[in-house]
Amino acid sequence: MGVVLFIFLVLFPLATLQLDADQPVERHAENKQLLNPDERRGIILHALRKRCCHSSWCKHLC
């Protein structure tokens, strides 16, 4: 009886929590795939144009 309670009260909730943790990552990946290629290209080009720091902070690292 104790083993059955342990399984249902401890192990089963732990297994379900682990599965719930995977869902936001999959949802984020689905959102990225829904972008059309032009939007995706614009996001990537915008990110590439950004500098890593201001010129007054670093001169040769960027």
UniProtKB/Swiss-Prot annotation:
Keywords: Cleavage on pair of basic residues, Disulfide bond, Neurotoxin, Secreted, Signal, Toxin. GO terms for cellular component: extracellular region. One of its GO terms (molecular function) is toxin activity. Disulfide bonds join C52-C62, C53-C58. The cysteine framework is I (CC-C-C). Alpha4/3 pattern. Pfam families: Conotoxin. The keyword Cytoplasm does not apply. Expressed by the venom duct. The keyword 4Fe-4S does not apply. Shows excitatory effect on mice by intracranial injection, followed by rigid paralysis of the rear legs and recovering after 30 min. InterPro entries: Conotoxin. Belongs to the conotoxin M superfamily. Residues 18-51 form a propeptide. It comes from the Eukaryota. Its main location: secreted. It is found in: Secreted. Residues 1-17 form the signal peptide. This is Conotoxin Mr1e.
